[in-house]
């Protein structure tokens, strides 16, 4: 008997008035590009319903809330952990994960007054199971179509780690990827459906750069990240991370958000296949020409 494909739309409703929560932690450059594009579009299929940050000092979140007349929710992660007797806000320990769950539950209560059909994680740092409540689109500074020998995504990790890994593998280019986040407990970091990637952002390799990267990678062996994060490899990665943001993130993320709101994407959870207008399209490429 032929297996039946279980293809499902990501969105629960098909409406011309979708509402999105915009989550951010830092400078908010991705959020800025997405919100500006949306505001300029007279036929926009979604609207921002709330801006969310875990940092009381996030000026970008305050600015966007005022600029676009959108409510702002600030849920202080550091203060919450301190109130529960913890100085560090990580999820590496059982106690840390328990507090993160409490923090997320409190965030859910804070978001109840606002309509949310999906969320845009535009540089939102905390890992949170709020991603189980509605689809959460996230930009990632790595090409998630690149797999290791076991068929697993290779360029995963936070901040500049995917760029560093691409450099250590001597890859010819970088890409930004947009995924629908899943719980970090179920798929690990950077799991979830891959909706789109940016066009390649070339790495300008020279013999000297190859040697510098290889030497720095060798010197890292046996050391903790805090001991080497500002080494030559880290500095090169930081430069390329900025190039990737401009030529990758800012190109692919706004377009994927609009295509997502338009209902173009669907997903077969059994096979992990993403569909675009009914055709398999995992890792669909977006270029500046289509902006």
What do these predicted ranges mean?
Residues 1-291:
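One-carbon transfer enzymes
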